[in-house]
Amino acid sequence: AEDLFKCDVFVFVASKGIPPVGSGVKDVRMYQFENNSKIVAQYARQARKENFKGLFAVVSDPVDPLAKTAWLESNKDDSGVLDYQGLRPEQVHGFGLGVMNARAAYFAKRDERFKRFLTEGRSFGPHGQDLVVADSITDYNDELSKELTELTVTANLHMRAIGFKPFIAPAYSSGAISLVLMMRGEWHCGSVFLGGIYMGVKNRYTAFGLETE
């Protein structure tokens, strides 16, 4: 444990679990946040204690609130007072948007109406209900974008409804693939600190710092 932060990238994937299918829990992400925020806070405080200078990557759900929790908790002293002596905002990065972008691409490949998304589209926001999918950033169509957003947001609910927990797709699209792209300095989908919150956008790390599209 003492060597945990002797690295360039720390990836937080711990989770206390999710409600079983059919449990009746309506807000799964709030349930996850209540449990996982306590765990991420513990590691964020350890990162502060060890003066960690690398990247603190959050993959566990709900990504965006957990990323902010990690940043805030690392910046509190032993009395719980914010002193901003911990992780810098750009050191914390959330990885949850990748799978939403991939789900939007899945529907775009199956429906001609959405095909522009594959070359002109973008996904913004959190890994959850407040996601915004734009069918095109050059010739935006509000009606099509809202329909594609709805399909994307509810895709995991359909998986749960037929008895599966949708974890493989996020592990690949939001986790493994996006992490590799980030470490290569390539464009990828992820949550970065914008205006006081962690917001999912297309971004990359450069020699001059974080760049958002």
Question: In which residue ranges do the predicted regions lie?
Answer:
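Hydrophobic, Leu/Ile/Phe/Ala-enriched alpha-helical segments that form helix-helix packing faces
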Residues: 1, 43-51, 70-75, 176-183
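Rossmann-like NAD(P)-binding element
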Residues: 2-55
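Structural signal for hydrophobic packing residues in well-ordered secondary-structure cores
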Residues: 11, 18, 74, 180-187
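Short beta-strand segments
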Residues: 13, 58-59, 194
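Short, charged/polar micro-motifs that form catalytic or ligand-binding hotspots
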Residues: 30, 56, 60, 163-166
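Conserved active-site and cofactor/substrate-binding residues in soluble primary-metabolism enzymes
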Residues: 35-38, 42, 65, 171-178
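Rossmann-like dinucleotide-binding core of oxidoreductases
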Residues: 55-139
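Long, compositionally biased stretches enriched for glycine and/or charged residues
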Residues: 100, 108-213
